[in-house]
């Protein structure tokens, strides 16, 4: 798969589809580009070219020393976009990816037609901060296999546990197989802890969709809604599921994203 050298790191990426407009998907903490498996085909079927990539610190991208920041990771995304000559594209970020997408939209609004901020926040509150701090501590003290097993009840809903035990087992197996080193996971956690766009949200004028999940316990609906209220051109959507709603309930999540992007395609304006 292709790799570009961008912003001082090697970024592993994949292009799917050949639509006349492009959407770039940004992963959450610890996820590589395979995490978007449930989104690729629906987005391609909607006429989009889809670009996925591994953030610094995970997958086949470089693993530079940490800690990382959301602003630094947004610069990685910008360097990738410039290398691929992207312009006027749609940007989608989930969790940590949503923090990165905020920084991108604030720094490079002219690049974007729209931005989707899913299961994310403008600044962590005390509860979310404490949870992410523990994730980093578990990874460094007990290793990534333990971290992946511990993480699951935080990111998947009780309903998903009850209805899809075999699928959950397969997902956990894949998470453990693809896990990054504990130190680079902790480096990504640092970006979650230090992110703060609260004083700048009012200047984010790119059309935005904020998605929250009704059973997300780590980035609660109320925390995402707090961000939504500060955005001048934002829409709001609630989908069923936990923090990983895009994995456990991909259909409503995908429909919300595609419907929003359709409103902001070039042909509409």
PLM feature spans:
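Conserved HGGG/HGGXW glycine-rich cap/lid loop of the alpha/beta-hydrolase fold
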Residues: 9-62
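Active-site loop/oxyanion-hole signature of alpha/beta-hydrolase fold enzymes
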Residues: 51-52, 56-92
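Gly/Ala-rich beta-loop-alpha elbow adjacent to hydrolase catalytic centers
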Residues: 93, 97, 101
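Flexible "cap/lid" loop of the alpha/beta hydrolase fold
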Residues: 102, 106-107, 113-142
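Conserved alpha/beta-hydrolase catalytic His-Asp/Glu region
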Residues: 126-128, 145-200
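Short beta-strand/loop motif that positions the catalytic acidic residue
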Residues: 204, 210-212
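Acidic catalytic loop of the alpha/beta-hydrolase fold
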Residues: 215-219
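Catalytic active-site module of serine/aspartate enzymes centered on a nucleophile-bearing elbow/loop
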Residues: 234-269
């Amino acid at each position: 798969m292709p790799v570009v050298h961008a912003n001082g790191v090697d970024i592993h990426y994949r292009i799917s589809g050949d639509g006349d407009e492009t959407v770039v998907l940004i992963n959450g903490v610890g996820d590589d580009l395979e995490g978007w498996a449930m989104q690729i085909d629906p987005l391609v079927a909607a006429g989009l070219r889809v670009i996925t990539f591994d953030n610094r610190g995970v997958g086949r991208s470089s693993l530079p020393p940490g800690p990382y920041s959301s602003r630094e990771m947004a610069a990685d995304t910008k360097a990738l976009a410039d290398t691929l000559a992207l312009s006027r594209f749609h940007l989608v970020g989930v969790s940590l990816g949503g923090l990165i997408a905020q920084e991108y939209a604030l720094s490079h609004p002219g690049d974007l037609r729209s931005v989707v901020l899913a299961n994310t926040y403008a600044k962590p509150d005390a509860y979310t901060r404490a949870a992410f701090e523990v994730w980093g501590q578990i990874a460094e003290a007990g290793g990534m296999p333990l971290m992946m097993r511990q993480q699951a009840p935080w990111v998947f809903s009780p309903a998903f546990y009850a209805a899809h035990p075999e699928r959950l087992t397969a997902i956990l197996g894949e998470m453990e197989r693809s896990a990054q080193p504990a130190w680079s996971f902790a480096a990504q956690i640092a970006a979650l802890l230090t992110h703060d766009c609260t004083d700048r949200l009012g200047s984010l004028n790119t059309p935005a969709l904020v998605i929250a999940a009704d059973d997300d316990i780590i980035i609660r609906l109320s925390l995402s809604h707090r961000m939504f209220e500060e955005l001048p051109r934002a829409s709001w959507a609630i989908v069923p599921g936990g923090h990983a709603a895009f994995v456990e309930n991909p259909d409503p999540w995908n429909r919300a994203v595609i419907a929003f992007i359709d409103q902001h395609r070039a042909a509409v304006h």
